[in-house]
Regions:
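A short SAM/SAH-binding and catalytic strip from SAM-dependent methyltransferases
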Residues: 84-95
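Short conserved loop adjoining the S-adenosyl-L-methionine
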Residues: 73-79
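S-adenosyl-L-methionine-dependent methyltransferase catalytic module, highlighting the catalytic core
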Residues: 98-103, 110-197
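Class I SAM-dependent methyltransferase SAM/SAH-binding core
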Residues: 32, 36-73
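Alpha-helix C-terminal capping/helix-to-coil transition sites in glycosyltransferase folds
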Residues: 19, 80-81, 107
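Conserved alpha-helix/loop element of class I SAM-dependent methyltransferases that forms part
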Residues: 4-20
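Class I SAM-dependent methyltransferase "Motif I" SAM/SAH-binding loop
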Residues: 27-29
């Protein structure tokens, strides 16, 4: 992966996953995260992807992948089947985020979600200037975006409380650096680790 394509959320996720863990990567895209985890942490994992091109790319990357629409649920997987269920920069494209989080909590001991923080100051400034934000974490124009549910760090904390998820760790980053001061304002990417209460 080139430096311009580096996914800092992948680095953080990798630091949370122990060797040999059972991992389900929802919306796995080309399988880069899962392939990396298999190589470095020897995880046993599966990817779930709806896009046929993503499925083919995942297979080419050596990832076991299932073509499935996350909106229909994860009935193919039993309760507690995985140690970790990951949803990386996909939450904002889900129609029913509450249901998806509930399914993550059902099939996994822990969940990890990453998403672009809509509360980031540059996004707020773009809106104040009269247009929707376009950035590294929100790379689409308003008219061609798959993102339908944008949220802030605080919004996601509230959703976790609503669905009965206990937040174990949360990090907000900008340009690969953790933001500790006013993270909802100064961080452009949020990474949460949680489990069922």
């Amino acid at each position: 992966m080139s430096p311009s394509q580096q996914r800092y959320d992948f680095e953080l996720i990798s630091s949370w996953i122990p060797e040999g863990a059972r991992v389900l990567d929802l919306g796995c895209g080309d399988g880069t995260l899962l392939a990396g985890l298999a190589a470095t942490q020897r995880v046993v994992g599966y990817g779930v992807e709806i896009d046929p091109a993503g499925v083919l790319a995942s297979v080419a990357n050596g990832v076991d992948v299932i073509q499935l629409d996350l909106e229909t649920g994860l009935s193919a997987f039993g309760d507690g089947a995985f140690d970790f269920v990951i949803l990386s920069q996909t939450l904002q494209a889900m129609k029913n985020t509450e249901k998806v989080l509930g399914e993550m909590l059902r099939v996994g001991r822990e969940g990890i979600v990453t998403f672009p923080n809509f509360g980031y100051w540059k996004h707020r400034l773009d809106i104040a200037m009269g247009h929707m934000p376009v950035s590294k974490t929100l790379p689409y124009q308003w008219y061609d975006t798959p993102n339908i549910h944008l949220c802030t760090v605080k919004d996601f904390e509230d959703l976790c409380a609503k669905v009965g998820a206990q937040i174990l760790d949360e990090r907000v980053i900008t340009g690969g650096h953790q933001v500790n001061f006013m993270p909802n304002l100064l961080g452009d990417l949020a990474v949460f680790r949680f489990k069922r209460k």
